[in-house]
Amino acid sequence: MSDAPAAADFKFSSKEIVDEASGLKIKASEPKPAGKLFDDSAALNVPRPKMYWWLPPNLSTGYGRKIDQLFYLILWITSVIFVGVQGALLLFLFRYRARPGAKATYTHGNNRLEIIWTVTPAIILVFLTILSQNVWSQIKGSSPSGAIPIEIHAEQFAWNVQYPGPDGKFNTADDIKTINQLHIPVGKPVRVRLTSIGKDGKHPVLHSFFLPEFRLRQDVVPGMAIDVWFEAARTGQYEIACSQFCGLGHYRMRGYLSIHSQEGFEAWLKEQKA
């Protein structure tokens, strides 16, 4: 675990450069005098997830597809059960409705039926648990070898992003720091360490790091350093959202995830070191 830097260390403004390989417009960060940490107007320009059918498009080459498959499998199972139960209710309402001359019948239960509707859901739940555990292990297990290390320190109301410099170590003079701007190359795993540092390094609160298109959501808990990983399938610019209410400015705690070619990412790193 690394020591969380004070929020005052992160004072940056933005300028736009173009990734020549992909044509993607990305944000480069440069130091500026200490002032307002986050421009409210920037929240209006953050790309929103595009919804196709039930979910935004999956851009994760790792576990995103498996998460979607679980969602749809559970949706189909619960839909079949819902339709079956509602159909049975309607059938019984019609078949056993009150009619002139009809006598009510009484039953003390049916052991066979009791076993069936107890064991069947139990089998379904065990089956879903096994499938979910496999996906959970892939998400929460160790990140793939060669993953790019990045640290993100959450505060009210910004994502402070930190990359190691040429020495490969964090919290040294050559670190690269940005605010609300996460840059990664396409097709390469990224390991992100999440911490909550609080405003000006004081009174950290709970946040939640959310990348809808990558099926990644992780609570950022004060006092804990939590690792997550993901891998992008294509270039583009996407939203970094906080999905946990963290104060009155929660609505503007949004950032950019810029994904570009390996050449473009290296050009961006070079731009930061210049």
Which role fits each region the language model picked out?
Residues M1-L37:
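Soluble extramembrane regions of membrane proteins in the secretory/endomembrane system
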Residues P5, D19-A21, I26, S60, ...:
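A general, composition-driven signal for non-globular sequence regions
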